[in-house]
Amino acid sequence: MNYGEIKTCDIANGEGVRVSLFVSGCTHHCKNCFNDVAWDFGYGKPFTEETEEMLLKALEPDYVDGLSLLGGEPFEPENQRALLPFLKKVRERFPKKNIWCYTGYLFDKELRGESRARCECTDEMLSLIDVLVDGEFVQELYSVALAFRGSENQRIIDVKKSLETGEIVWHDLVSRGISMKFN
């Protein structure tokens, strides 16, 4: 797997201060994607053990709330295979930090159902993620007023609660004063 960018102090892609990893490779090709350069699986630099260690070091400070995975597409099967061992390390070393993941795949229909995104790593990778922002970016549904989403069709899902209940459970941002607009 390659990655296009790492941000060690990101406040735009999840709650609080985050370390964000932008992986390379995406087959969605959303119209007006903010990161279309990362569609190419060969874009950027190789994701190595040194990269993992640098990210783990960046997660150490107490002010860092967690890790965000973006792309490209973290749930392309080849990316899942590279990310799963890393996410296990993050969970082991930082059990109190949260993991957010942005994906164009739908949680209930494609990641939990049958689709090209499913592979031997999918269920375990989902079990390590706290919050999933799912759904392709749709330019016609774009709004700058959305918290942590680009378009109104995207959902912010509490993965742990959704897996426990078998139903989609929205992540609770409203109770913490973050306005969310839903149609």
Task: Mark where each language-model region is.
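Short, conserved loop/helix-junction motifs that constitute active-site signature segments
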Residues: 124-127, 150
